[in-house]
Curated annotation (Swiss-Prot):
Coiled-coil region list: none
This protein's GO CC annotations: cytosolic large ribosomal subunit
Lineage top rank: taxon: Bacteria
NCBIfam families the UniProt entry points to: rpmD_bact (TIGR01308)
Organism: Pediococcus pentosaceus (strain ATCC 25745 / CCUG 21536 / LMG 10740 / 183-1w)
CDD domains, per database record: Ribosomal_L30 (cd01658)
UniProt record similarity statement: Belongs to the universal ribosomal protein uL30 family.
Record key words, sorted: Ribonucleoprotein, Ribosomal protein
Name by which UniProt lists this protein: Large ribosomal subunit protein uL30
Pfam families xrefs: Ribosomal_L30
Gene Ontology MF, one: structural constituent of ribosome
Length: 60
């Protein structure tokens, strides 16, 4: 299964509480922090909600 590298591009400050929670649950802290996550439905659902704050690239 492939994996996704998720990088926080914009700050989660002054965003909806749900969006801030998703950023923390994905393991992203500060701007420009990155994390590698499995490419599954749960991850893609979370990414959908904060797509305007992050950058996603596929890692093999």
């Amino acid at each position: 299964m492939s994996q996704l590298k998720v990088t926080l591009i914009k700050s989660a400050a002054h965003r909806l509480p749900k969006q801030r929670t998703i950023v923390k649950e994905l393991g992203l802290g500060r701007v420009n922090s990155s994390v590698v996550l499995p490419n599954n439905e749960a991850t893609r659902g979370a990414i959908f909600h904060i797509a305007h704050l992050i950058e996603v690239e596929e890692v093999k």
